[in-house]
Amino acid sequence: MTQDSEVLLWHTVLQRHRNYVHSCIGDFTLDRSSLATAEADTTSVKGPRSSKKRKELQLCLATQDCVELYDVSNGTLDALGKWPIAATILSMTKLNMDRCSHTILVLITDSGNLTFWQFERDSVSGKVYVRTLANEPISRSGIRRFVPQYQMVSDPQSRCVFFSGIERSKMCVLADWQRGKLVVGSPIEIQRSDRITLASAACDVSFDNPVNAAIEVESGTNDYYLSFYTMDLGLNTLLLRKEHLLEDKSINFVMQCPNLQQYKIKTRPNDETDQDSVNPFVICGYDGYLTLIDLEGFYEVSVQLPVRKTVSSTNIINGTIHKLKKDFFILMQSNHGDMYKVGIIPDEETKAPVLEIAYFDTLPTSEDIHIFKSGALFNVSEFGTSYLTQFESLGEDLEKITSYTPGRRSFIETESTLKNLSILDSLTSLNPLTSFHASNSTPLTILAAANQTENLVKLTSAVDFEELISTTLPRIPSKLWTVRIPKNETHSLIFLSMETSTTILKIHEGTVEDFGGDSNPFILNKPSLFVGAMVQRSIIQVTRDCLLQIIEMHDGPYTKKLEWYPPAGVGIVTAFCNETQLVVALTNHEICYFEIIEDSLNELQDRVEMDSTVNSIALLAGQKSGYCVLGCEDSSLQILNLQSKHPDFFTICAIQSLISKPHSLLFMRDTSDLKIHVGMKSGVYLSSKLNINDGTVFDVRTRFVGTKPVQVNLLDNIDINHKDDDDDEPGENDSKIDDFKKKISDFTPLVVLNSSISWVTYEIDDKITLRPLKTDEGITLKHINAFITDDIKRNGCCSITSKGQLLIGKLDNFLSWSNWFNEKKYTLVNDELKNAGNEEEDEDEDEDEDEDASEKYEIVGYQSQRILSDTTDNSLSYVISKTANKETSLSAIRDDKLLATNNGNTVVIIAKEVFNAVCSCNFGTNVKYIVISTESGKFIVIQIRVKNNVLETQYIHETMVHSKVNAMVSFGDKLACCILGNVVLFGLGKKQLLRKSITEMPPYITQVTALDQWDGTMLAVGDIRESVTIFKYDIDNNSFIGVADDIVKRHVTTVKFIDVSSVIGGDRFGNCWVLRVNYESDTRVASNIKACQYTLETLCHMYMNDTPMKFEIVNHMNMSDRPAILWIGLQGTIGCFVPLITRKEQQLYQSFQSTYAELDVLHFQDNNKPEEVDLEETEGALDEAYHTTKNTDHQDYVEGVISRVGRDFLSYRSSYAPSKNIIDGETLEQLTTYLPSDQRWIASKMKHADSGKLDIFNKYINEMRTNYV
């Protein structure tokens, strides 16, 4: 960046946070093939009742701005889709209406609308889309305490939705399913002044008038009430039916109970005559006990909670009901994670309700818990990991406490091992995320401080190559082919082309052995140029002066059927074949063409003479390829027509120039397109499409992938969604069809690019993904091919390395745009402390370790962590952690490996106090130092030595500064920090740190929260309230001079220089901004010596809905041609800013963004166009003609269907200040999540001249991910 350049940034989210705050379960997806049938059923207003029995095996989770859908029917969390929205979700519930076969999702957001969603599944692709059924306005946009948008619950019979604000307002909206469509009534409101709502629940009253129970506080008297509100369906009015004054003010929780009459429990005394209506019950949670209360006030039954001895307060925070055939039970969780099984049983004599409770198990503290009909339980954790568990027991033998003895107390002891549950699957979370370090290497690797006890997370943006077999070859091969006869399901031969010979390996019964001897008909004393398989049993081997056709006989051996030689003095350059076609390129620039019929190889008499030597050939895999792609030495790509009935058969029909000579080619069919992949000798990878009608090449894209020539290879039959635990155990299910034959739609063609770094590219979710391929110890692959055997049924591959190794393995952990990183956890444990308590443990525990693995959950403990990069060694990082004993520990990581001390410890205690801030610096020497600022106002200096990957630490000294320092930074050969209103530079002394410079700061800087420096000359100071101030270091006077400050108050959390006069930062409210010194703003009064001369102007601004914690600049991320700015959010967000450099890029994406923000308006205009009316026939009725619109059925049109919640994303991104100079790529990337018809309509509205088609728009969006991220 330069001072005069305009900053325009592209922003996208690489990993979304998982702070789940809302959830519900149901049958959400509707097959789109049955949608038309449902809409066509208009025989009656109501329509037929749904006869489908709901399984409710789908889980809907929501963060503040994203909805996720999972299927748990297979015992795992299978993701069906993610849908970010441009609003903050305040509450969420569901509706299971009688005449609707699927579940409707209901959302309340700060857009001011009540939104109803329908999930539709494509029966062909299996992809799930969202359709907005209604956006019912209930208030203005924004978050207000009087607006009913917080507590939302749905009637158990799904007739209406109750919701209330924090104060005063309560509302009810009726909903029904008629003629295959959702009908939503107008909101009905009730006002309760001076009432604050703490919690609410919808009562089960069968088909009586819906009832809502709420815990309320009278703000004037501080009295607590349990209030019951009734929606009178006859009067269409929301009424207060009854309220109970509560004496105990520790109440915090309320949940509904089932209709107890169905379980032979008396709900009214015998003398009560009104037995027809249902008397609903609720359970209220107090500090240490539960109470069962009914609406009429006849019963109030209490029972004590089993509590821990070490805690003083226990409160219920969530609960769920699970109904059995003739019974039910309630599962509740306390604020300590303890789960209780609660039951309501009838008294043996009076049949009055009796409350019983028992301790069930312990899980991490959750926002909510859900029980599925399959016997699985899911806890929705806002922090840490959420678990999908299976009931091993219902706890029938648990010790129970009943309401017969309401004063009885019981104490429990908990463990990290589950007793009645076993873990099936989990969703990990990085929330809270406070620090990270990103490497400048490829692939992008991030060390993230997730603040979880004894854990450190490494995130890698690469596909994993899992090595199974490795062997070193006697000579380094140049090429590799794996041969699978089309009639066989597994590979049988491996060909290795050496410099002067060919080696053949045979796969037999799971072993790889040398294939040689006199019976071998293949050529072994010459290097092979090409090896391939044709028709059912033919193998083609091509050398420089010979072409062989080898037939595999039925009884096993191979025999030679054809031996073809080129003309005298002419050699073969290269060749390629598919199942029926073979093309050979000769040194005299001629192209020979063969076709095989019934194992007979027939040559076409005509030959094509090229202007240049052909060094690579590609055909479509399969029976017949209509075109052949030729790569020529004159840096061109030429298309040869092979359509026998075409008038231009066997002629060049198209030519595409390249930027360098091609090295390898690949021609394949991907979904509906023909694609060409070209690896060039300059290290550039090119992909393009081929027009199937005339053979022309279009949609050309290039990417630099390495410093060596690029070898492209195809791996077909790759299952991207495959998991290792899906494999059958040996000996089981032998009668089943092999995995790779089950579903053709499950497989995705994958292209591997081998250069100085290996890459893979594939299409997932209609988006192109290009990611590095990560191997063990960074091995560079040279050539790779598919490899399927009886032991490796899916994703297997065989490759050779640049060092002459033969690797057999499989590809795993594929990435997508919504899942950009693979996660790995490091365990940070002091081995001495760990082993001290385990010396006398029984040796048999090791045998039970695998059995208990599914019964242990991660104890959610938080420790403050900071990750630092060494100032001189980029491969070395430090992890500073707070221990459970309130000490400070250090761990070091180099090249993805934890370094250990001479004693074998990976964790070293470096201070007996808790750190507050840390900094890595060298004080102008070659020695590594860590400076720790403690809570007591000390600076502790630790020296670090790393020799032969052995970590050594040494305490140097400590310095009292008598102030709590929150931020430090290495400044040249000194340490910069802010102490008591001064900028202080420290130098290294023998006994303590020495103050080298002290500069007084302006008085408005009161508490410094962030510091950063630029090249030892500029210092940026971020204040907790007064934004950023930039200082310049005056070397002559050894002091700092104030250069610029901000006129806007910002609560700074982090700041980072991006050039000498510009900084990027974030504030505590979730905004990211770029500030630059405005040197034209010299309007300050000279007499005010403490004020800065210039001001900072805001270049960029955008609301992110996550508090930025740290920024890092990564130069040439994943070998891109420009730097990127990575940032992390407190809730676990990982985002990326990419500068848009060219004017064309800036105009293009600005046009996309402005049009995207107007889509709701454009959609409204397209659906409400005035009809053309003949003025002569109207006879002056202009007013009536003026109001005639195209869409006469206004109920079919839904406002805000494109934004999904009725709010454009630019308004959302401008929550605190207008969005400026940042392209919201995260929103533009969501195009493929819309219905196909909406995708085409959106693409047609883009204003750019070339963006009228959907694929063109997708191309521009894909370029940002594939080229720069």
Curated annotation (Swiss-Prot):
Keywords: mRNA processing, mRNA splicing, Nucleus, Spliceosome. This is Pre-mRNA-splicing factor RSE1. InterPro entries: Beta-prop_RSE1/DDB1/CPSF1_1st, Cleavage/polyA-sp_fac_asu_C, RSE1/DDB1/CFT1/CPSF1, WD40/YVTN_repeat-like_dom_sf, WD40_repeat_dom_sf. It is found in: Nucleus. Pfam families: Beta-prop_RSE1_1st, Beta-prop_RSE1_2nd, CPSF_A. Associated with the spliceosome. Its main location: nucleus. Involved in pre-mRNA splicing and cell cycle control. The keyword Nucleus applies. GO terms for cellular component: spliceosomal complex. The gene is RSE1. It comes from the Eukaryota. One of its GO terms (molecular function) is nucleic acid binding. Belongs to the RSE1 family. It comes from Kluyveromyces lactis (strain ATCC 8585 / CBS 2359 / DSM 70799 / NBRC 1267 / NRRL Y-1140 / WM37). GO terms for biological process: mRNA processing; RNA splicing.
